[in-house]
Amino acid sequence: MANEMEFEKPILELKSKIADLKEYNETSDVDLTNEIEKLEKRLAKLESSIYSNMTAWDKFQVARHPERPTTLDYISLLFEDFMELHGDRTFGDDAAIVGGIATFKGIPVTVIGHQRGKDTKDNLHRNFGMPHPEGFRKALRLMKQADKFGRPIICFIDTKGAYPGRAAEERGQSEAIARNLYEMSDMKVPIISIVIGEGGSGGALALGVGNQIFMLENAVFSVISPEGAAAILWKDASLAKKAAESMRITAGDLFELGITDGIIPEVKGGAHRDLTAQAEEINKTITKSLHALMAFSEEQLIKQRYEKFKKIGVYETI
């Protein structure tokens, strides 16, 4: 229960009450079956009401849930014969980004994604999913390899952002991100990017120059975190909830703005509730997108990607 979120409190309280009644019903002579059934119907309505009316801040909390599935979780369910590749051939390996070659329904692909840790030790090893330059350069090495051998590229995005430490800056963090944007724009193979959790700033963009970009229903994508925006705008990070509502960071917002190409439904309560069911939803999206993009020629893929990003941010003054 420690990982449950504030907006779920009414649901948890009712679930607890139902559990207590069921336990009592098993040991008592009093039949509480009807009362339990009524409460379960009430619970279903309450869950439907709360989960269908989540605010941007609620979704941000779900996107950051410590049990939210990671890139490796999805790789294990979506792909066959995955072989992880390591290192950028310049400085070293970065565990905050994982990637390798695999097959998707018989199609050879390259899979790359941010990787958060599952516990404190793992998070320290993976730097909480915040890549150093060598992580982005490893990703680019794998992309160039995919481009050379004609393998589609599938990227999973889930990071607070690129690591802002001194060592990362000394090794060329901004150049590494910019290089990925530049090189990805000219890849001759299909690129599908999926935001599975938090899409934070340039760290997310470095895997986000795709022919098609999708977001999980409760994922977020923004130039800065709500806490950071609140600290800058109002000098008060505690106003993060207000900032989240103003920033338009949700999957619905990004789709409405024309930045993403679709929203992948999440299981009720968030992807962490049922990994297998959530992987199946992602599977449907990748299948449809991959088959559509593989019908494009190399020139069409490059042109489509260019036109997609050229349109972002365009507006007319009336």
UniProtKB/Swiss-Prot annotation:
Q: In which pathway does it act?
A: Lipid metabolism; malonyl-CoA biosynthesis; malonyl-CoA from acetyl-CoA: step 1/1
Q: Where in the cell is it found?
A: Cytoplasm
Keyword terms: ATP-binding, Cytoplasm, Fatty acid biosynthesis, Fatty acid metabolism, Lipid biosynthesis, Lipid metabolism, Nucleotide-binding, Transferase
Q: Which GO terms describe its biological process?
A: fatty acid biosynthetic process; malonyl-CoA biosynthetic process
A single Gene Ontology MF term assigned here is: carboxyl- or carbamoyltransferase activity
Q: What is its EC number?
A: 2.1.3.15
Q: Which reaction does it catalyse?
A: N(6)-carboxybiotinyl-L-lysyl-[protein] + acetyl-CoA = N(6)-biotinyl-L-lysyl-[protein] + malonyl-CoA
According to its UniProt record, this protein's enzyme class is transferase
The record's InterPro entries line, in alphabetical order, gives: Acetyl_CoA_COase_a_su (IPR001095), ClpP/crotonase-like_dom_sf (IPR029045), COA_CT_C (IPR011763)
Q: Where is the CoA carboxyltransferase C-terminal domain?
A: 38-292
Mention any Pfam family matching this sequence: ACCA
Q: Which GO terms describe its cellular component?
A: acetyl-CoA carboxylase complex
What is the similarity comment for this entry? Belongs to the AccA family.
What NCBIfam families does this protein's entry cite?
accA, AccA_sub, PRK05724.1
Q: How does it assemble?
A: Acetyl-CoA carboxylase is a heterohexamer composed of biotin carboxyl carrier protein (AccB), biotin carboxylase (AccC) and two subunits each of ACCase subunit alpha (AccA) and ACCase subunit beta (AccD).
Q: Which PANTHER family does the annotation name?
A: ACETYL-COENZYME A CARBOXYLASE CARBOXYL TRANSFERASE SUBUNIT ALPHA, ACETYL-COENZYME A CARBOXYLASE CARBOXYL TRANSFERASE SUBUNIT ALPHA, CHLOROPLASTIC
| Functional note | Component of the acetyl coenzyme A carboxylase (ACC) complex. First, biotin carboxylase catalyzes the carboxylation of biotin on its carrier protein (BCCP) and then the CO(2) group is transferred by the carboxyltransferase to acetyl-CoA to form malonyl-CoA.
Query: What is the protein named?
Result: Acetyl-coenzyme A carboxylase carboxyl transferase subunit alpha
Query: From which organism does this entry originate?
Result: Listeria monocytogenes serovar 1/2a (strain ATCC BAA-679 / EGD-e)
